[in-house]
Amino acid sequence: MFTGSIVALITPMDDNGDVDRASLKSLIDYHVASGTAAIVSVGTTGESATLNHDEHVDVVMQTLELADGRIPVIAGTGANSTSEAISLTQRFNDTGVVGCLTVTPYYNRPMQEGLYQHFKAIAESTDLPQILYNVPSRTGCDMLPPTIARLAKIKNIVAVKEATGNLSRVSQIQVLVDDEDFILLSGDDASGLDFMQLGGKGVISVTANIAAREMVELCALAAQGNFAEGRRLNQRLMPLHQHLFVEANPIPVKWAAKRLGLMANDTMRLPMTPLTDPAKRIVEDALKSAGLL
């Protein structure tokens, strides 16, 4: 469940900025039909930053209910306060989520020892499997391979989502981690195939929101070692990988999902604003290049 194409699911909202349950069900059904390995609910792409604590929990619980056991659900539980991250994580004990994705603390920029103690405390507060999430471009905080290796020794820390785009990190982590069951996942669609060729086991993907079957196929080709065919597919998807970040994620991917009829609205809460017209043209061209339009 922690390998293959895992979607970093967008959170559909109605015109008032409330969760659009009908569109959420539509998205989940789409991923079930497409063979997506798992859903990450309320991560960065799910707009965790603009949902309050209770709303965050509610979206994950609605996702669990609508998934109804058809696809595993991973809860995003990151916070830049250790106590808040523990509280959020513990809300999902015995709910049916299969694990938690926890981002490094953002803005306060802890030292490596602080990162170790932060994730250790969270892991020790629950039996739920934990996926570390390193995305320094968002957080201003880079969790280095030696720290990841220390954390990998903790029983229920089972994986890391590496979103630096730095492919050398794969081998650096592999050399330092002596547990062959510890899973490396790419958090960067554009370098995801190369990441898997170096030993990664999948991608937690933004692109999968709108190209679910294609990302499932890409990860399957990588798992089979068929990188020649994988590169042909990835070349077609590359404009999407790149241009879904033409403006801040998840602005472009929400517009694309609406454009493809996967959900009713591309509403976001401030300070996130709608996709601009020039960016719409760029994303539209990427959708056409990928064969989605």
From Swiss-Prot:
The keyword Lyase applies. Pathway: Amino-acid biosynthesis; L-lysine biosynthesis via DAP pathway; (S)-tetrahydrodipicolinate from L-aspartate: step 3/4. The active site is at Y133, K161. Keywords: Amino-acid biosynthesis, Cytoplasm, Diaminopimelate biosynthesis, Lyase, Lysine biosynthesis, Schiff base. Its main location: cytoplasm. InterPro entries: Aldolase_TIM (IPR013785), DapA (IPR005263), DapA-like (IPR002220), Schiff_base-form_aldolases_AS (IPR020625), Schiff_base-form_aldolases_CS (IPR020624). One of its GO terms (molecular function) is 4-hydroxy-tetrahydrodipicolinate synthase activity. It comes from the Bacteria. GO terms for biological process: diaminopimelate biosynthetic process; lysine biosynthetic process via diaminopimelate. It is found in: Cytoplasm. It holds the Pfam family DHDPS. It is an enzyme of class 4 (lyase). Pyruvate binds at T45, I204. Catalyzes the condensation of (S)-aspartate-beta-semialdehyde [(S)-ASA] and pyruvate to 4-hydroxy-tetrahydrodipicolinate (HTPA). Homotetramer; dimer of dimers. This is 4-hydroxy-tetrahydrodipicolinate synthase. It comes from Yersinia pestis. The lineage of its organism: Bacteria, Pseudomonadati, Pseudomonadota, Gammaproteobacteria, Enterobacterales.
